[in-house]
Amino acid sequence: PYGPRPVEEILLFTEQMIDRLLESDVKAVVLACNTITVNCLPALQQKYMIPIIGMNLAAEAVNQLSEKRSVAILGTAATIAAGKHLEALQGVDTDLRAYPIPCYDFAALVEAGHIGDSQAMSAVSQYLGDVRGEVDVVVLGCTHYPFLAKDIEVFMGDTATIIDPRYCGSSQKP
């Protein structure tokens, strides 16, 4: 997972991957990672002469679905620190209350296979405990997090809609 890594290292790794892809004469690159999208997309688009497409930050979906005008944004530490989800949401509705929550171990839990178990539920309650009942939308700001969507749904009950940005399309700008 890239979330705990410094932005410079994330950019370096991503450039190495793109350089490798260019050896195969690719015509475009889709960044299927929120951390890379929010931290590196403009630099990558400037460096490479092919289309570089990032993840959608789901601001329009939140705007349409949130009746309380209150949303939790779950992401890696690097994704939350970049502030791009918050910026995108405030660009759509300045009255929206957003709770950016860095979920330090979600990606590692998923990679270790802790889905639907007590460790997953413990982590979900740790990160979402303070906003349960406050928010009516939860944005999954990392491509690992949909694996924990059922755990999040169980914890939040029917009080919140889960938005998986994989289904919101892609974005040219973070």
Where are these regions (language model features)?
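Non-catalytic structural scaffold of enzyme domains
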Residues: 1-174
